[in-house]
A protein has these predicted regions:
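Short glycine-aspartate micro-motif
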Residues: 2-6, 58-60, 125-129, 135
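Short glycine-rich, Thr/Ser-proximal phosphate-binding strand/loop in the N-terminal lobe
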Residues: 2-40, 73-75, 144-163
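A cytosolic small-molecule/anion-sensing beta-strand core signal
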Residues: 18, 63, 140-141
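Adenine-nucleotide phosphate-binding core of ATP-dependent small-molecule kinases
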Residues: 27-57, 167, 171, 177-211
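Glycine-rich phosphate-binding loop and adjoining helix at the ATP-binding site
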Residues: 32, 36-43, 47, 55-59, ...
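Short glycine-rich anion-binding loops that position phosphate/pyrophosphate groups of nucleotides
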Residues: 64-67, 131-133
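Glycine-rich phosphate-binding loop of actin/hexokinase-like ATP-binding domains
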Residues: 120-172
């Protein structure tokens, strides 16, 4: 059995799989908004699973941002800024008293699809995540293409317009981007989930905004 943790800006989702990849347990809870509490929350999640099943399981965590290849610190975590400049892999491994494998969330998603998902028959796979942010992972021959700056595949941060533009795709189509645009237009703060809920309820303004 093994435990997978998806650390996002708004939630921590955990899953326990058996040796055949069959799901045995799943849980979701709100993400803390600081680094110390994030480490504690993930540790508690793993401990609670192991109390019910088995201790000493393998643990993997996918997270926003990338890991600096020289320092081992997380970088470019725009929607969970408390992770930046932290040696997350070291700290969570120490907290759980075992080696914990950590990787960018979009890379993990794309890699998983390349092995046993909808992209398993393809040599080159590009996976896209649309959540609080806008991420991408590039897989070639079932290996993650990291790039010299650990930023390969991150299409959400491609500038829009001139090369000096500070605008990028994530500012428009991610959850956080939609929230900023919504506030700019209506002067009302709503999270992305609420915006889509109102649109589904046929709110004219919200339907037009989503379009």
């Amino acid at each position: 059995m093994q435990i997978g943790i998806d650390l996002g800006a708004t939630k921590i989702e955990s899953v326990l799989l058996d040796d055949k990849g069959i799901e045995l347990h799943r849980n979701r809870k709100e993400s803390p908004k600081n680094y110390k509490e994030t480490i504690i929350s993930i540790t508690d999640t793993v401990n609670n699973i192991e109390k019910k099943f088995k201790k000493g399981l393998n643990v993997g965590v996918c997270h926003p941002g990338s890991t600096n290849l020289d320092t081992g610190e997380i970088q470019n975590s725009y929607n969970s800024p408390w992770l930046n400049d932290m040696k997350f892999s070291v700290d969570i491994s120490k907290s759980l008293n075992r080696k914990v494998l950590c990787e960018n969330d979009a890379n993990c998603f794309a890699l998983s699809e390349s092995f046993d998902g909808s992209a398993q028959h393809y040599k080159i796979v590009f996976g896209i995540i649309l959540g609080s942010g806008c991420g991408g992972g590039l897989i070639i021959d079932k290996k993650i293409l990291v790039g010299p700056n650990a930023f390969a595949g991150e299409w959400g941060h491609i500038p829009i317009g001139s090369s000096n533009s500070k605008n990028n795709i994530e500012q428009y189509i991610s959850g956080k981007g939609l929230e900023r645009l919504y506030f700019s237009k209506f002067k009302k703060k709503l999270v992305a989930k609420e915006i889509f809920k109102k649109a589904r309820e046929k709110s004219t303004n919200d339907m037009e905004f989503i379009k």
